[in-house]
C-alpha cells in the first residue's frame, strides 16, 4: 500500500521529507527506488527546480517516459506546475529541452 511504500522509501532515503517520499511513490510506485538510485543526499539528485523536482527525476522522465517539454511533465504527468513560479517552470522546460530524447533501456 502507498503508506507502507512511502515509509520504506523515506527510511531508505532519509533525506526525503514525508511529502517528497509520498510524491515519489504516487508518481513512480516501486520505480521510485530506480529514480533515486544510489543517492545519499538531495544534492546527489542534481539541480533542485522547486517542489522537490530534481535533475535526476527529469532525466528519468526524459529517458523512461519520453517527456519532451516542461509542460508535459509539469501539467500532464505531475500537476507540479501548480507549485512552481514562472521562472521555475521555464527552468524545467529549458533543462528538458537540452536533453535529446532517448529510448527506454
Residue ranges, per PLM feature:
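C-terminal accessory subdomains/tails of enzymes that are appended
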Residues: 1-105
Amino acid at each position: 500500500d502507498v503508506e507502507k511504500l512511502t515509509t520504506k522509501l523515506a527510511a531508505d532515503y532519509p533525506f526525503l521529507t514525508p511529502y517528497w517520499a509520498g510524491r515519489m511513490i504516487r508518481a513512480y510506485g516501486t520505480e521510485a527506488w530506480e529514480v533515486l538510485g544510489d543517492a545519499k543526499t538531495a544534492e546527489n539528485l542534481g539541480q533542485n527546480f522547486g517542489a522537490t523536482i530534481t535533475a535526476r527525476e527529469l532525466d528519468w522522465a526524459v529517458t523512461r517516459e519520453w517527456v519532451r517539454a516542461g509542460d508535459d511533465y509539469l501539467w500532464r504527468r505531475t500537476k507540479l506546475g501548480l507549485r512552481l513560479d514562472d521562472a521555475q517552470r521555464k527552468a524545467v522546460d529549458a533543462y528538458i529541452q537540452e536533453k535529446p530524447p532517448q529510448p527506454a533501456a
